[in-house]
A protein has these predicted regions:
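Membrane-associated alpha-helical segments
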Residues: 112-221
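Perimembrane helix-loop junctions in membrane proteins
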Residues: 102, 106, 193, 221-224
Length: 224
């Protein structure tokens, strides 16, 4: 997290989200352009979320896309920016997962209508790899069910963390994505089994044909 001046912060996360506090659109665009050449696997998908922070309240309150806090501190700002960034990250993972789910459904519909798969073994392996890689990235980068260490001994920080997770429905959305990924993985594993059975059947037919050919050759040799 970079402290720019007393009221401005930039928080860059390893999973590709950048969170800004008290920056206008022009400055945000300039910073994104500045860091883009240094990004790995840069995604053209632009997702954003705005969240309002009001200070000077007599107690901590949560509203629609808003939080009211008593006194602003760096730890509070960091915690808020962390939760907002995880909400945006979940939006991204939802989009990617939904695309995979649509592609999987197309294959199941084709299987239902034609009784066969419309995908090669190589492409199937790629889909399985994408699914496993996505599950791994989510597990590695998001801490939906864990709280940052600074909240363990600070009642206000813990209350803010719990409240923000509830406000953004982080746990519900996380479970939904995980369930969708499991469905996708199960379907692809089923496709793989079908493909292996098909390849095994073709191999058996080839072996039978070879045996019959050998038998026919032996019969012809005896008759000649």
């Amino acid at each position: 997290m970079e402290f720019i001046d007393r009221n401005k912060f930039i928080y860059v996360f390893k999973y590709g989200v950048v969170s800004f506090l008290n920056y206008d659109e022009i400055k945000i665009s300039e910073f994104i352009q500045l860091i883009t050449p240094f990004c790995k696997n840069f995604s053209g998908l632009k997702l954003s979320e705005e969240f309002e922070i009001e200070t000077g309240s007599n107690e901590i309150r949560f509203g629609f896309n808003k939080i009211e806090i008593i006194k602003p501190t760096t730890d509070i700002f960091r915690l808020i920016m962390l939760n907002v960034s995880q909400s945006v990250a979940l939006d991204y993972y939802y989009e990617v997962t939904n695309t995979l789910l649509i592609e999987t459904n197309l294959q199941t519909q084709y299987l239902e209508k034609k009784g066969k798969l419309n995908i090669s073994g190589r492409d199937l392996k790629k889909y399985i790899g994408r699914t496993l890689n996505l599950k791994s990235n989510i597990a590695e980068n998001l801490y939906i069910f864990d709280s940052p260490p600074e909240t363990w001994e600070d009642e206000d920080l813990n209350r803010i963390d719990v409240g923000l997770k509830r406000t953004f429905d982080l746990q519900v959305r996380f479970r939904s994505i995980q369930e969708s990924l499991q469905i996708i993985k199960d379907n692809f594993e089923l496709f793989k089994d079908i493909m292996q059975y098909r390849n095994s059947y073709v191999l058996e037919v080839i072996i039978i044909i070879l045996i019959l050919t050998e038998v026919i050759n032996l019969v012809i040799e005896k008759l000649m």
